[in-house]
Amino acid sequence: MNPQEKIICSSNGLELSLDEYSRYGRQMLLSEIGLPGQLSLKRSSVLVIGAGGLGCPAMQYLVAAGIGTLGIMDGDVVDKSNLHRQIIHSTSKQGMHKAISAKQFLEDLNPNVIINTYLEFASASNLFSIIEQYDVVLDCTDNQYTRYLISDTCVLLGRPLVSASALKLEGQLCIYNYCNGPCYRCMFPNPTPVVASCAKSGILGPVVGTMGTMQALETVKLILHINGIKKDQFDPYMLLFHAFKVPQWKHIRIRPRQQSCKACGPNKMLSREFMESSPKEYTTICDYVPTLSKQLAPIRRISALDLKNLIETSPHITFLDVREPVQFGICRLPLFKNIPLSEVDSLQNLSGKVCVICRSGNTSQTAVRKLQELNPQADIFDVVAGLKGWSTEVDPNFPLY
């Protein structure tokens, strides 16, 4: 804002500039907002954790609406694979910290908003000192451990949490830890051993964009205490979205705060001191143990260059691609037959050498273990780094996705 610009004082002593009157005028015409609501937005501070597919639209609409301060927390950098859904970032920003890329975009969108960046991933050691500076927190991450960590921290600091997720064609949204409502751990007390991700299962850009936009909307409602989000009148609910179904939206009531919850129940087991000083013990007491796949023995793995030689010299080897059919249809190597991981149990008569490949060398290891149990007579092995390794080591023109 130009320091020479004339300041107009509102009736309650807070200030809006001429630019802000012009900028926010269309939403100030709404009876639900008006000048008091706009001033409430200007007084507010919001932390967005994750500057990706959810965070990008959420930040855009919150900054455009005129919140006072925005915090952006993300330790990742912009990658080309992000750009179809993370619409704040651009081709020229590849390799730049997402938080910096977002700040540049948002400062140009609305220079009246104070924007702070945190170029780090959320952890038990840094999250408390950051969240306590803000009024509302948005969880825009796609990591299960981080979701529990953010929720637990918000509970201990008394901050409301607007959480959303999106995968494939579906999304969900919920406000946690508000007016004695449930926290994330109340709803999902036990972490799921295997969690799908956008990188593995896919995501349609407008789906995650819709959910991020809804996070911004629910945050505005929360700040203004309107439309069912009034203090002491809040009835917890979850919004469910499916892009290709009719109706697309479902609004469901959710259970209240749980007495048995380790984070917010009367006998809670968590404290700030414990979480900050004992991160390993925190993951244990909260039943979160990251699932780490045990690597196959080196004798059961070959490089992409070794695979090239096998394709050229060993036509009698059985070549299996254990990706899903839709991925197999995107790109494939010659000689490989598509048998998805879910169907490898049907292969019980294999013999000789069997080479297994997948997208990046993880699913193929699981497939090899299953096939070894079913076919102890066969010599079964996989390709390190899968098709990504093939593109890196053998054929740079092979498409990655």
Curated annotation (Swiss-Prot):
Keywords: ATP-binding, Cytoplasm, Metal-binding, Multifunctional enzyme, Nucleotide-binding, Nucleotidyltransferase, Transferase, tRNA processing, Ubl conjugation pathway, Zinc. Its EC number is 2.7.7.-, 2.8.1.-. InterPro entries: MOCS3/Uba4, Rhodanese-like_dom, Rhodanese-like_dom_sf, ThiF/MoeB/HesA, ThiF_NAD_FAD-bd, Ubiquitin-activating_enz. Its main location: cytoplasm. Its cofactor is Zn(2+). ATP binds at residues 53, 74, 81-85, 98, 142-143. Binds 1 zinc ion per subunit. The keyword Cytoplasm applies. GO terms for biological process: cellular response to oxidative stress; protein urmylation; tRNA wobble position uridine thiolation. SMART domains: RHOD. It is found in: Cytoplasm, Cytosol. Residues 313-399 form the Rhodanese domain. Zn(2+) binds at residues 183, 186, 261, 264. One of its GO terms (cellular component) is nucleus. The active site is at 198 (glycyl thioester intermediate), 358 (cysteine persulfide intermediate). In the N-terminal section; belongs to the HesA/MoeB/ThiF family. UBA4 subfamily. Plays a central role in 2-thiolation of mcm(5)S(2)U at tRNA wobble positions of cytosolic tRNA(Lys), tRNA(Glu) and tRNA(Gln). Acts by mediating the C-terminal thiocarboxylation of sulfur carrier URM1. Its N-terminus first activates URM1 as acyl-adenylate (-COAMP), then the persulfide sulfur on the catalytic cysteine is transferred to URM1 to form thiocarboxylation (-COSH) of its C-terminus. The reaction probably involves hydrogen sulfide that is generated from the persulfide intermediate and that acts as a nucleophile towards URM1. Subsequently, a transient disulfide bond is formed. This is Adenylyltransferase and sulfurtransferase uba4.
